[in-house]
């Protein structure tokens, strides 16, 4: 998967945020599907926007007043692993 990656997650308005630009819509949508499976596995679902080859993600936890928790940080790490499959666990 070829993409431009915002290196770090930003903390914006009490949410973790990342934007990723892919080669095309198909690669962006493939990434979204992979994130959907992760979200189900962790029972933690991101807010996202997809416009053609760009995917924007926000992570936050509803149960604590829409703030960032360890659950969000864990999900961010798992999403990053999808973007960099050669990361060692």
What are these regions (language model features)?
Residues 1-89:
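Charge-rich alpha-helical segments
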